[in-house]
């Protein structure tokens, strides 16, 4: 039995693939219904009006309009989509 470990191998040197989380559409940006607004783990951001939430806590637009971020009670940040004004016909 060798009393010294052979050189040339490392027990470290691995990392997991990044998950590309974060805010995808920022305040004031125009979005279409179905656009992903935030990818997150848990509810760092909460859905406000015009925004839905997926089973993995992804926030997405339910309507076409402009994105907004609002901080309300309990220091919760809500993401909203304000519908674009419909042109008069």
Curated annotation (Swiss-Prot):
GO terms for molecular function: structural constituent of ribosome. One of its GO terms (cellular component) is cytosolic large ribosomal subunit. Disulfide bonds: none annotated. One of its GO terms (biological process) is translation. InterPro entries: Ribosomal_bL27, Ribosomal_bL27_CS. Keywords: Ribonucleoprotein, Ribosomal protein. Pfam families: Ribosomal_L27. It comes from the Bacteria. Residues 1-21 are annotated as: Disordered. SUPFAM superfamilies: Ribosomal L27 protein-like (SSF110324). Belongs to the bacterial ribosomal protein bL27 family. This is Large ribosomal subunit protein bL27. It comes from Caulobacter vibrioides (strain NA1000 / CB15N) (Caulobacter crescentus). The gene is rpmA.
